[in-house]
Regions:
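N-terminal intrinsically disordered/low-complexity leader segments
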Residues: 1-10
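Hydrophobic alpha-helical connector segments
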Residues: 60, 74-100, 152-156, 175, ...
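Hydrophobic/aromatic-rich alpha-helical bundle segments in the mid-to-C-terminal region
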Residues: 119-123, 127, 139-189
Length: 192
């Protein structure tokens, strides 16, 4: 579902792509500027020329990934007649295909507890996604108040996050089963 296209010939973009890959594979604490430079195949001096600290680089990469995710998600939703279906399809796509993004999300959520910049970026993105879903519920089901639509969007996203955690932890997880449950939940949320 998500496509962040870093321009691979530009050293700055190679660095961002390497950071994204390492964050998703190893987690925040396990990476260093040296490891990022090695993964990007650039000299450490070149890395620090573009990005002074690991934190500033990670914050930038996370911000770009979340913006790309939201923009792609919003465009697909806005270009559809059945917006709730597109939302559920997007969640299903992440559950079936996007292991790197799932791991990145869990890493960023855990790191946001101690990094205020990441906390703000993640919180802003989270709010935008929840508002988009709530607006779709309100438009689809005209009887809903914004308060109820907001609650329904949170329940749907919470189900998706729970499924991502279960998938990562390999806790009795079946992608098809989870996707079906989320699809059914989305439909039931609209009926109430």
């Amino acid at each position: 579902m998500i496509s962040v296209n870093f321009h691979k010939k530009d050293p700055s973009e190679k660095i961002k792509e390497a950071t994204l890959n390492l964050l998703a594979e190893k987690g925040y604490e396990a990476i260093s500027m040296r490891k990022i430079a090695k993964e990007a195949n650039v000299a450490l001096g070149q890395l620090t020329y573009y990005y002074k600290t690991k934190d500033s680089l990670i914050v930038l990469v996370v911000k770009e990934v979340l913006e790309a995710f939201y923009n792609e998600f919003e465009e697909k939703v806005n270009n559809s007649d059945n917006k709730i279906e597109v939302i559920v399809d997007g969640i299903e796509s992440v559950l079936k295909e996007e292991t790197k993004i799932e791991r990145l999300l869990i890493t960023v959520i855990s790191q946001a507890q101690v990094n205020k910049k990441l906390q703000k970026i993640l919180g802003d993105s989270w709010s935008k996604i929840l508002n988009l879903i709530a607006t779709c519920y309100m438009n689809e089901y005209e009887k809903l108040t914004m308060e109820h639509a907001s609650l329904k969007s949170r329940l749907l996203v919470s189900s998706a996050i729970e499924s991502i955690v279960e998938k990562i932890l390999k806790v009795e997880f079946s992608t098809d089963n989870q996707a079906t449950l989320i699809r059914e939940a989305a439909e039931k949320l609209g009926e109430e």
